[in-house]
Amino acid sequence: MIFFYMNPILIAAAIIPAIFLLVKVYKADRLEREPPLLLLSLVLYGIIATGLAMVTEHLGSVVLNSIFSQNTILYNVMMYFIVVAFSEEGFKYLLLKNRTWYSPAFNCQFDGVVYAIFVSLGFALWENIGYVLRYGFGTAMVRAVTAVPGHACFGVFMGAWYGLAKRYDNMGKQSASKICRFMAFLLPAFMHGCYDFIATMESVHYGWIFVGFIAVMFIIALLVIRNMSKHDRYISYSSTYF
């Protein structure tokens, strides 16, 4: 009922970027499109991850504030790399694996990318609504080209390793699968930490670094999507690609 009392223009501005990216990724799934109900559930899991991350981030900030002085380099590193990035990417990954690892629909390597992006954009969608309602339309425009596609990029990096982990698991290579699953959490968490850390530094130089970081991250993510979509194959095949 709460949505009836919200500005529909702000709500649209908050959700359209995420929906646009979801449609693009869905269409990139070349071999076999995923069940719509599964994808919808992943978006909902992403929304759940938002709430869980809010709790752990609040608790983490309380602990950090009792140990470190705020707005120092060390404080920001601990906050954005450990508290924020580990919380958000950790819950995304845990819910992603819980919902999809044993799903019969998870039969292609690119599926890992699709699933991870849907969870990430579910997270971004709900987070974006909160920011836009609090700060207005200008925030929606900025986040439409930064935070929302940023979460999608984190999902690409998570999903690329996650899909590879599933293939190794199917091949019986459990050690390789575990390493890939660990990377599916660690790499997006590191990229997320870099994103937040650079974005919060109050310096013109860091502003340009942030723009460059986003540009490089977007380009790499798009290349990964294009390559994995083009060369996608069923998990049952023994060969790998990345």
Which residues does each predicted region cover?
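Hydrophobic alpha-helical segments at protein termini of multi-pass membrane proteins
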Residues: M1-F242
